[in-house]
């Protein structure tokens, strides 16, 4: 299946393109599509989280896209995400983050997830994914983008457990938790409350720009055994991989160069500043995915694969 890229790029006109995009996904052999309905933080003090007109999909928009996905024999999954009117790293840094602020934040975020969980239930979505990386400062032992503590309350684990239980009271289907493969997993108390783990995967597969397909497949297996298997063994939960390797030189080694600096993969997506120095390489992207698929095929404990970053309005290659 695929995960659509929606955050910061959604427009109501997507409904015009969605059906053709879903046809393409189905024709490629996809069975699932992940939608990421968003709400926007419009203020830091107090934190206000609401759907922004024209930038966040309304419930009707998400419902219509799920129906179009179903019409193309695709299971719909919701991965609720947040955005802000500025970079989220700046938003978190500038927020007050005292006790009353955190209480307000969790209240607003709970309302957001309750809304999305109810929508998932009403539309018959196959699953809902929690654990949006953009709210990582609110996770237990959360940090800001500079690595400093976010000041999240000491009872953060209990707050997230309660939040998961709230979602489950609205939605009776499968709940997954997103974990970045490069980060430490959340506490067991959180993972024990969900059904499976959605492992966000952009792990380097080569130590150099010179690519060796066989060596990449071996490295992919080594990384899966080191990062994914321990999650399965410690939680007893299945793992779904969310693969993200852009079509740019350096993607397989984890460093797409632009002006001699490694660019974050998300900065290669539409509506971000152009990266003219990044070199297009569809071949490298293909080799990275082939290496991962070869490794996954030898590991039955991986229960699914999704390709992240599909852009519905047009067939694009990364900048």
Q: Which stretches of residues belong to each language-model region?
A:
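Boundary/entry segment of secreted carbohydrate-active catalytic domains
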Residues: 1-26
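Alpha-helical scaffolding within the catalytic cores
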Residues: 16-21, 112-116, 180-188, 223-228, ...
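Conserved, mostly hydrophobic/aromatic
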Residues: 25, 33, 128, 197, ...
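A solvent-exposed, charged loop/short amphipathic helix patch at secondary-structure junctions
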Residues: 43-50, 96-101, 144-150, 211-215, ...
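Aromatic-lined carbohydrate-recognition surfaces of secreted/lumenal glycan-active proteins
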Residues: 75-83, 127-137, 152-186, 236-250, ...
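Aromatic- and acid-rich polysaccharide-binding/catalytic face
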Residues: 115-134, 140, 179, 183-219, ...
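Aromatic-rich peripheral "rim/lid" segments of glycoside hydrolase catalytic domains that contact
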Residues: 277-291, 295, 299-319
